[in-house]
């Protein structure tokens, strides 16, 4: 089972990725984790990436693809892998295809933007304990304070409505086009590709976690 999980920020990809990896016994491949590991280990690609990052630049797709290919050679990937947060752009998807990285499924978790905004902007956190609440779905007993300590809850900057909207705008411009890219490749194929086209699946990411997980597993049958 080799797959890419697509969906907007706040669509619940992280939660479902965990369930998928547990069910199929595959690792979750995060480019951020790979970069940190390569830099720490001092591999040739890690050294190259560190130079770029130290200079405040963005690590090139060539370096990222090199890291991906190295990571997929490791033993834990022999039964498959799940890409988390990669590819983010069409050039990265093209580079993966060109490098012969095989994908069985591309799974999109589709959640309307207004539902994501409500889901994320309603979160409240007790900083000291990490306990989380939601003003609508999981409210504290007393508005604005932690159930156990009575201390104030905060809304993280990342969860503020204007921040969420900005992240969704970036997703719409950069990552949303991947939905069309992969669905078209799945439907029409690509004779020049080094790997077979993936199957494209889209599920609704609205409802409780168990309902969404059931849809995910049904889509991956």
From Swiss-Prot:
Binding positions (ATP): 10-15, 123, 132-133, 207
Chief localisation class: cytoplasm
Cited Gene3D superfamilies: P-loop containing nucleotide triphosphate hydrolases (3.40.50.300)
Keyword Glycosyltransferase: no
Residues that, per the record, bind AMP: 31, 36, 57-59, 85-88, 92, 156, 167
Region (NMP): 30-59
Organism domain of life: Bacteria
Region LID, residue ranges: 122-159
EC code: 2.7.4.3
GO molecular function, one term: ATP binding
Localisation per UniProt entry: Cytoplasm
GO cellular component, one term: cytoplasm
InterPro entries registered for this protein in UniProt: Adenyl_kin_sub (IPR006259), Adenylat/UMP-CMP_kin (IPR000850), Adenylat_kinase_CS (IPR033690), Adenylate_kinase_lid-dom (IPR007862), P-loop_NTPase (IPR027417)
Reactions catalysed according to its record: AMP + ATP = 2 ADP
Domain notes: Consists of three domains, a large central CORE domain and two small peripheral domains, NMPbind and LID, which undergo movements during catalysis. The LID domain closes over the site of phosphoryl transfer upon ATP binding. Assembling and dissambling the active center during each catalytic cycle provides an effective means to prevent ATP hydrolysis.
Function field: Catalyzes the reversible transfer of the terminal phosphate group between ATP and AMP. Plays an important role in cellular energy homeostasis and in adenine nucleotide metabolism.
PANTHER family: NUCLEOTIDE KINASE (PTHR23359)
UniProt subunit comment: Monomer.
UniProt name for this protein: Adenylate kinase
Source organism per UniProt: Cupriavidus necator (strain ATCC 17699 / DSM 428 / KCTC 22496 / NCIMB 10442 / H16 / Stanier 337) (Ralstonia eutropha)
């Amino acid at each position: 089972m080799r797959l890419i999980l697509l969906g907007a920020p706040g669509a619940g990809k992280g939660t479902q990725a965990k369930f998928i990896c547990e069910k199929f016994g595959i690792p979750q491949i995060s480019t951020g984790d790979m970069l940190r590991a390569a830099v720490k280990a001092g591999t040739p690609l890690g050294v190259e990436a560190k130079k770029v990052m130290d200079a405040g630049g963005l690590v090139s797709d060539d370096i990222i693809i090199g890291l991906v290919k190295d990571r997929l050679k490791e033993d834990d990937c022999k039964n498959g892998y799940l890409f988390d947060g990669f590819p983010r752009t069409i050039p990265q998807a093209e580079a993966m295809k060109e490098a012969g990285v095989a994908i069985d499924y591309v799974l999109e978790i589709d959640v309307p933007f207004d539902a994501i905004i409500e889901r994320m902007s309603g979160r409240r956190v007790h900083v000291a304990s990490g306990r989380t609440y939601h003003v609508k779905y999981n409210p504290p007993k007393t508005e604005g304070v932690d159930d156990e300590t009575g201390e104030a809850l905060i809304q993280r900057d990342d969860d503020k409505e204007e921040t969420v909207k900005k992240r969704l705008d970036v997703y719409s411009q950069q990552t949303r086009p991947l939905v069309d890219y992969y669905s078209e490749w799945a439907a029409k194929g690509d004779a020049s590709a080094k790997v077979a086209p993936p199957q494209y699946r889209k599920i609704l990411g609205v409802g409780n976690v168990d309902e969404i997980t059931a849809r995910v597993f049904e889509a991956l049958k």
